[in-house]
Amino acid sequence: MIVIVMGVSGSGKTTVAALLAAKFGWRYREGDDLHPAANVEKMRGGTPLTDEDRWPWLRKIAEEIDGWRARGEDGVLTCSALKRAYRDIIIGDRPEVALVYLKGSQDLIARRMAARHEHFMPTALLASQFATLQEPTPDERPIVVDIGGAPGELADRVVRELQFRSRDSDAASRLRPGPQIP
């Protein structure tokens, strides 16, 4: 199983995804690390990315997912995945990929972003992310998690929902705590 943790910048993707990966002993990949340097510099400079900027990045994420699938590996990956078209690229017809949407108000997320200092994404771009955001629809089968709680509580909610959804599938045995994989 592969879990994509999505949401706007500052929603807690990195923290929740790392907790999920640690709980299951799965691989973890920060989607931001796959951005071309030009994208990072553009965002650092306060310029929102365009679709044309994002397509190569999204294809890299899809390639990462396909590599895990080819090797039979489970993993957790973060990606803002703001539009349905972006999610179609990274999830597509990959039935073993689950989508987790970390949902929160712009005000709450802006406060969180203001408190962090080591990330390239400035708070000034948050409004553009919310303007771009197309929330997942029921046909995408997202696990929607309100980000109002502590990160551990959010991760636990995701674990319970993944276990519930997978109770009758091959993935059920892989949704138990396991050893940490680098």
Where does each model-flagged region fall?
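Hydrophobic anchor at the beta1->P-loop junction of P-loop NTPases
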Residues: 5
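P-loop (Walker A) phosphate-binding loop of NTP-binding proteins
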Residues: 8
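Conserved phosphate-donor/acceptor-positioning beta-strand/loop module used by diverse small-molecule
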Residues: 93-112
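Small-molecule kinase domains that catalyze NTP-dependent phosphoryl transfer to phosphate-bearing small molecules
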Residues: 115-157, 165
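Conserved substrate/cofactor phosphate-moiety recognition/catalytic segment
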Residues: 18-60
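Walker A (P-loop) ATP-phosphate-binding motif of ABC ATPase nucleotide-binding domains
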Residues: 2
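Conserved lysine of the Walker
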Residues: 13
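Glycine-rich phosphate-binding loop used to anchor ATP phosphates in small-molecule kinases
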Residues: 52-94, 102
